[in-house]
Structures are given as structure tokens and as C-alpha cells.
């Protein structure tokens, strides 16, 4: 008999099976499945949204970007993007990150980088006003070739602060125009309708005070921390990164040039090689000197720009603090009106108590008079009751006595200062 062959040996398997690697599935077309069958589908929560991009020249464009693209483009964590979602209500905040500034003030929510501003494509009037005003300012500076001391990110941040402060101040002025007439009317006419109106206005005042106080605290927090202000200077960090990259590139080119001049075996040793090596050393020394000089200039410019940012924040801090002072004055006026109303209500209550006291004294005197007259209404056998004129004298004397008694009560109350003199 011939040699039996193992039907399960690798040599007897078909070519298309033996050529596949173990552990990799095979499809019916002879191709391996290298990915998830639904790799083309987007992950949940990665839907695209409309964003408005404004560059340094004032040109705006609408972009369709998803959350992951924004995070990668601006180097932001996902929690910072939640501040930009108009569906959620978050307190006002200004966050400085490595490559961007996340701003959420009032209804203006945007991402500011060293080159562009990205904001939600909302139809809110504040966002539309911010977009048009920023584009107009940037385009005017670009057309007139005006060089401003403030970098791009500070210009965008300044406009956000300006519009937010104007919006808050307008809300405060509107509330003042509505509150003062109502309080004056309430001081003269205390009614349930006026009290309910003042209660609603006081709720609006409390909400607006919290919003203004949050903006004021956020600006003050930035002013108190120099590191946060330095972190917000994106243009300087970008220039330093580019300078550092160019220095590394020069160093690498110098090292390659030096190694090619020294290690070359095909060319004979000549003064040219030594010259190239000396040139590489000189180039590296020059680049190190230039790098140290640039770092010194960058550090000094950071200090100057921190001062610029601090002055910018301080200016708007004064504006917000003035708005907060208006709200405090308005709250004090409401408290004074409430105190006046309580005084008036207390006065009315005292008058009611005085009237009740007089009525009680009159009731006591009338009860005495009624008790005396009731005696003559009894069926008693006495000579006094037989004389008709006696009853008239008794009534007269009792009435005069009750009058003197009531007058004595009034004098006693005045003596004890229960009644005003």
C-alpha cells in the first residue's frame, strides 16, 4: 500500500485557506474583515452642529463640525463644550486653556483662539450683534492697516465683555424704570395687586443680581490670578511655540550639516570639512544666543500683556461693579418701601387696637347702665318703685355717672400714653 496522507495537514489544505492568518475572519469574497461592520456610522452624540467662524480679518463662515472635531481643533475637554450648549443653563465663566479661551457670558458663548473665534450659529440677537460688531471692527482695522496693541484674542474677549456689560446694564435700567413707579404707588396705596407686582419684581431683581454678581466674581478671579491671565495670552504662546520649533529645526540642520562634513568617508580630509564643522558650531551658538534673546523678550512681553489684560479686565470690572451698585440701591429702595409699609400697617393696627379699647370701655359703661335700669324692671314690692318720677331720676343719675366713668377711662388711657396726646 502507498503512504497514507493526512487529510488535515497544512499541505493538503486549499491555497486560499492556508494563506489566511489564524484568528482573522474570512468573508465569502476571499478578503479579511479588518474593521467593525458598522464603522461608517457615527457614534452617538457626535452629530454635527452649525458653528460660525470669524478669522483675524473679520471674515465669517458657517461650519458644520461635530463635537470631536471641535475638541481636537481647539484642544478642549468635553466639559468645556457643555458651556457652549444653549440647551443647558450654566453660570457665567471665562476659562483659559492651552490653545483657546472658553467664554460663556450672558447669551454669548464662544471659543476664542489665537487665529479665530468659533461661536454657535444661534439666532439670538446678542450672538448676531456680537458677530456683526466683531466682523466690522476687524475688517475696519484690516482695511486701514491699523495695528492695535491688543492681540486678536483680547479684542474678541473685550467685545464679549462689552456687550455683556451693556446687556446687563440695559436689563438693570429696564428694571429700575419698572420698579420705582410701582414702589411709589405701593407707598401711597397698599393693595394686594401692588404687593403681588412688587413680589414678582423682587424675584427678577434677585435673579439679575445673581447674574451680575457671577460676572463680577469671574472677572475679579481672573484679575487676582496672574497665571490665569498669562494662560489666556494665546498669541504669545503660539509665537513662542513657533520660535522654539524653528530653533529646533535650525539645530537639526546644523547637526546634519556638521555630521556630513566630518563623517564623510568618500571625500579626503581637507580644510573644507573643518570649515563646515566650524560653521555648524557657529550656527548652533548663534541660534542659542538668538533663542535666549527671544525667550527674554517673550517673558518681558508676557508681563506687559498681563498688565494690558489686567487693565482691560479692570475697566469692565468697574462697569459691572457700577451695575451691581445700581442693583444694591434698588434693593435698598425696596427694603425701605417695605419698612414704610410695615410702619403704616403697624399704625393702622394700633388705631384698630385703640378703637377696640374705646369700644370695650363703652361696652363696660353701657353694661353698668343696663344693670341699673334692669333693677327697676323687676317685680319687687318697694315704695321706691311706686313713684314714677323716681325711675327718671335714677336714669339721669346713672347716665351722668356712666358718662363720667367713660371720660375717666379716656383720661386714664391718655395718662398711660395708650392714646396719642
Swiss-Prot record:
This is Magnesium transporter MRS2-5. Has the ability to complement a mutant in yeast lacking magnesium transport capability. InterPro entries: MRS2-like. The gene is MRS2-5. Coiled coil: none annotated. The chain crosses the membrane at residues 357-377, 393-413. One of its GO terms (cellular component) is membrane. It is found in: Membrane. GO terms for molecular function: magnesium ion transmembrane transporter activity. Belongs to the CorA metal ion transporter (MIT) (TC 1.A.35.5) family. Magnesium transporter that may mediate the influx of magnesium. Keywords: Ion transport, Magnesium, Membrane, Transmembrane, Transmembrane helix, Transport. CDD domains: Mrs2_Mfm1p-like. PANTHER family: MAGNESIUM TRANSPORTER MRS2-5, RNA SPLICING PROTEIN MRS2, MITOCHONDRIAL. Expressed in the whole plant.
Amino acid at each position: 500500500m502507498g503512504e497514507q496522507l493526512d487529510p488535515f495537514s497544512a499541505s493538503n489544505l486549499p491555497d486560499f485557506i492556508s494563506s489566511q492568518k489564524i484568528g482573522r475572519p474570512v468573508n465569502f469574497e476571499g478578503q479579511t474583515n479588518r474593521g467593525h461592520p458598522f464603522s461608517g456610522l457615527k457614534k452617538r452624540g457626535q452629530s454635527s452642529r452649525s458653528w460660525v467662524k470669524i478669522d483675524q480679518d473679520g471674515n465669517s463662515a458657517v461650519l458644520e463640525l461635530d463635537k470631536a472635531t471641535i475638541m481636537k481643533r481647539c484642544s478642549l475637554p468635553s466639559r468645556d463644550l457643555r458651556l457652549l450648549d444653549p440647551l443647558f443653563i450654566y453660570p457665567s465663566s471665562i476659562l483659559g486653556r492651552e490653545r483657546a479661551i472658553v467664554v460663556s457670558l450672558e447669551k454669548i458663548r464662544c471659543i476664542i483662539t489665537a487665529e479665530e473665534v468659533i461661536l454657535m450659529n444661534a439666532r439670538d440677537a446678542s450672538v448676531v450683534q456680537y458677530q456683526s460688531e466683531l466682523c466690522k471692527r476687524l475688517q475696519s482695522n484690516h482695511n486701514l492697516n491699523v495695528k492695535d496693541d491688543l492681540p486678536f484674542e483680547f479684542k474678541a474677549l473685550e467685545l464679549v465683555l462689552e456687550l455683556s456689560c451693556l446687556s446687563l446694564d440695559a436689563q438693570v435700567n429696564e428694571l429700575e424704570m419698572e420698579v420705582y413707579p410701582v414702589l411709589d404707588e405701593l407707598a401711597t396705596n397698599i393693595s394686594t395687586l401692588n404687593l403681588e407686582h412688587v413680589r414678582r419684581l423682587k424675584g427678577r431683581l434677585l435673579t439679575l443680581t445673581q447674574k451680575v454678581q457671577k460676572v463680577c466674581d469671574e472677572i475679579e478671579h481672573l484679575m487676582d490670578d496672574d497665571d490665569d491671565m498669562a494662560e489666556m495670552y494665546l498669541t504669545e504662546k503660539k509665537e513662542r511655540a513657533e520660535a522654539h520649533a524653528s530653533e529646533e529645526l535650525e539645530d537639526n540642520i546644523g547637526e546634519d550639516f556638521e555630521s556630513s562634513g566630518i563623517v564623510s568617508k568618500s571625500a579626503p580630509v581637507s580644510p573644507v570639512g573643518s570649515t563646515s564643522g566650524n560653521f555648524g558650531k557657529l550656527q548652533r551658538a548663534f541660534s542659542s544666543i538668538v533663542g535666549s534673546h527671544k525667550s527674554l523678550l517673550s517673558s518681558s512681553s508676557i508681563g506687559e500683556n498681563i498688565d494690558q489684560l489686567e487693565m482691560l479686565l479692570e475697566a469692565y470690572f468697574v462697569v459691572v461693579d457700577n451695575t451691581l451698585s445700581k442693583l444694591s440701591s434698588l434693593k435698598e429702595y425696596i427694603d425701605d418701601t417695605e419698612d414704610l409699609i410695615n410702619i403704616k400697617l403697624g399704625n393702622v393696627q394700633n388705631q384698630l387696637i385703640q378703637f377696640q379699647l374705646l369700644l370695650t370701655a363703652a361696652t363696660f359703661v353701657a353694661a353698668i347702665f343696663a344693670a341699673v335700669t334692669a333693677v327697676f324692671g323687676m317685680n319687687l314690692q318697694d315704695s321706691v318703685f311706686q313713684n314714677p318720677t323716681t325711675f327718671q331720676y335714677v336714669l339721669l343719675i346713672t347716665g351722668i355717672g356712666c358718662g363720667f366713668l367713660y371720660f375717666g377711662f379716656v383720661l386714664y388711657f391718655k395718662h398711660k400714653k395708650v392714646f396719642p396726646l
